[in-house]
Swiss-Prot record:
Signal peptide: none annotated. Required for vegetative and sporulation septum formation. Required for the activation of genes expressed under the control of the sporulation transcription factors sigma F and sigma E. One of its GO terms (biological process) is cell division. This is Cell division protein DivIC. InterPro entries: DivIC, FtsL/DivIC. It comes from Bacillus subtilis (strain 168). It comes from the Bacteria.
Length: 125
């Protein structure tokens, strides 16, 4: 009784089955479109994140370089202000006639009336 028979079953063609198959195909197409849109959107978000990160990194490095230059210029400004105050003091001293004569005697070996200059070297120990 074991007969090997092939059973061929024909599918029933009705409107409901065709409608369900169309709905399934439509769902598959929509899902495939959704995956494509999400992939493109994800790629755009990723590229935007890379651009923003590189921009932030370059601005950070630029900012740190400018801060270093600012510190250097502030130090230079401080030294120039100190030099300016020293020069103002020197100008006020040069307006004093006694100071100018003392400088002339010390640096230029000038003498007053009736004075003789003796150059004595200091002994080093």
């Amino acid at each position: 009784m074991n007969f090997s028979r092939e059973r061929t079953i024909t599918e029933i063609q009705n409107d409901y089955k065709e409608q369900v198959e169309r709905q399934n195909q439509l769902k598959k197409r929509r899902r495939k479109g959704l995956y494509r849109r999400l992939t493109v959107f994800g790629a755009l978000v990723f590229l935007t994140a890379i651009v923003l990160a590189s921009s932030v990194w370059s601005q950070t490095s630029s900012l740190s370089a400018k801060e270093e230059k600012k510190e250097q210029l502030e130090k230079e400004l401080k030294s120039l202000k100190t030099k300016q105050t020293d020069l103002k003091e020197e100008i006020s001293k040069l307006k004093d006639e006694d100071y100018v004569t003392e400088l002339a005697r010390r640096d230029l070996f000038m003498s007053g009336d009736g004075e003789i200059i003796f150059n004595v070297e200091k002994k080093s120990k």
